[in-house]
Regions:
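Low-complexity repeat regions of mature extracellularly deployed or surface/particle-associated proteins
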Residues: 1-188
């Protein structure tokens, strides 16, 4: 809801839901909580300086198993924050990001097992902060083209068999990858 510049975050509750958002323009905000066990979401953004902040089951009520989320954007200086489930309850989640533009920031905190997180990012000065936790078999793949990037990737599971791949083409940047399958602490 938006009235004269004021914004109220949405709150969607239910066992299973499908949400399709097509947002066009600059300086928009898409903020809210989703409480559902299975979410199918298509989020398309075309514009600059937009903000996307979503929490899926932040109170650990339903989980977020079998969710299929697609985030696509064309534009620059956008900020994306996604917190998906707690306690590895986003089992078999399929999360796909396609980002085209410069100076975009993705901050994703995903608690999953047997789930995938694929990011395809094209543009300069983009930042990715990914924290993937869960029991086992988390799959993270980042395919990036562009200069001056910043990646901070943490993937930790209780058991093992996680998979992580980063392919990046361009000049300059900072990359920190920590992967730990229940063993010793790691750091950059």
């Amino acid at each position: 809801n938006s009235t004269a510049g004021n914004l109220t975050a949405f709150d969607l509750d239910g066992a299973t839901m499908t949400l399709d958002v097509n947002q066009i323009g600059d300086a928009n905000k898409f903020l809210g909580d989703i409480n559902a066990d299975t979410v199918v979401g298509m989020f398309q953004f075309d514009g600059n300086t937009n903000q996307f902040t979503i929490q899926v089951d932040p109170t650990n009520t339903y989980g977020a198993d079998n969710s299929n989320l697609n985030v696509q954007t064309t534009g620059s200086s956008n900020t994306f924050t996604l917190d998906l489930a707690t306690n590895a309850l986003a089992g078999t989640t399929d999360l796909d990001w396609i980002v085209q533009g410069d100076s975009n920031t993705i901050d994703a905190d995903i608690d999953y097992d047997e789930g995938t997180n694929f990011m395809d990012i094209d543009g300069d000065s983009n930042a990715v902060n990914f924290d993937g936790d869960g029991y086992a078999q988390g799959y993270f793949y980042l395919d990036h083209t562009g200069n001056s990037r910043s990646f901070d990737v943490d993937q930790h599971s209780t058991l093992d068999n996680d998979w992580l791949k980063i392919t990046s083409s361009g000049n300059n940047g900072t990359v920190c990858v920590q992967q730990d399958d229940g063993g010793t602490a790691v750091g950059c």
